[in-house]
């Protein structure tokens, strides 16, 4: 199991880092007290999933050596690959971020009533043991949200860009538009196998439907055009820091034409090495009916 402990200065980007790790498939827990870390790790040992935990200044123990001892104990475990990811930023950057968001620093809330600058300085001192044990340190001073996300992804996975999952989904307009679609292609103008009595009971996954549709040049031309559209803009969409791209293809009932095109186009992108999911939402309704 890989365990990443995320910590850092308040306002340096811990929440962003945790969201990136969640997108990478990590089981994430925010603001776990250090004294519960061992018990938590023990409880998730069997889930067969990488884990990320954020440690906040508010839940650090009063004795700094307890942090070091806890992390040393976890690092000694043979079945745990421990990394400490520390998010840092310059005082000037943190002051600016707090000014822009108008949030209160966690250490300014206590009885000491510290100024923002004093709180930042104190936090830096209190987090020193974690910095010393960090295997990954990221300075977010000059990063925007997307740049920081890419840095975290690169440091953790060795690649900057998130691998986009392309979802190709067929549907029937009579059942309504899919709510999660990024792009919708209406293919109701194509020749319809529904009007061939022998083909009507079949679906777009069956060979006789393939043969019928592939006799029509407009079907093959549209397939090429949809593939070309997605291929052309995929690099830009991948740079947009998104996890999913959903392409919906619809015909009247979602049984023949849209199913055929969705399946063929999805398989085309699978063969190119992309992460692809193929769904036939309306086809499931026909089968249930």
UniProtKB/Swiss-Prot annotation:
Record-linked Gene3D superfamilies: P-loop containing nucleotide triphosphate hydrolases (3.40.50.300)
A Pfam family assignment: PapZ_C
Name of the protein: Nucleotide-binding protein VS_2760
Keyword match Oxidoreductase: no
Binding site for GTP: 56-59
Covalent S-S links between cysteines: none
Family (UniProt): Belongs to the RapZ-like family.
């Amino acid at each position: 199991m890989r365990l990443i402990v995320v910590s850092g200065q308040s306002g340096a980007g811990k929440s962003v880092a945790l969201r990136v790790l969640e997108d990478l498939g990590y089981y994430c827990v925010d603001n776990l007290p250090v004294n519960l870390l061992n018990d938590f790790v023990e409880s998730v040992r069997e889930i067969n999933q990488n884990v990320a935990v954020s440690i906040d200044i508010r839940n650090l123990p009063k004795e700094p050596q307890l942090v070091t001892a806890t992390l040393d104990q976890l690092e000694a475990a043979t079945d745990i690959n421990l990394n400490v990811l520390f998010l840092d930023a310059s005082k000037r950057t943190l002051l600016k971020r707090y000014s822009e968001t108008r949030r209160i620093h966690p250490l300014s809330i206590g009885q000491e009533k510290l100024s923002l600058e004093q709180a930042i300085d104190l936090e830096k001192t209190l987090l020193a043991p974690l910095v010393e044990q960090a295997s990954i340190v990221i300075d977010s001073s000059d990063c925007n949200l997307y740049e920081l996300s890419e840095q975290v992804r690169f440091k953790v996975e060795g690649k900057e860009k998130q691998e986009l999952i392309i979802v190709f989904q067929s549907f029937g307009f009579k059942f309504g538009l899919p709510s999660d679609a990024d792009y919708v292609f209406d293919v109701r103008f194509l020749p319809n196998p529904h009007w061939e009595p022998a083909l009507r009971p079949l679906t777009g996954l069956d060979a006789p439907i393939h043969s019928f549709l592939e006799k029509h040049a407009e079907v093959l031309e549209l397939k090429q055009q949809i593939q070309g559209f997605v291929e052309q803009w995929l690099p830009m969409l991948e740079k947009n820091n998104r996890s999913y791209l959903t392409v919906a293809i619809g015909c009247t009932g979602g049984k023949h034409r849209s199913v055929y095109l969705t399946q063929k186009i999805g398989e085309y992108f699978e063969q190119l090495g992309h992460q692809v999911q193929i769904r036939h939402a309306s086809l499931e309704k026909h089968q249930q009916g």
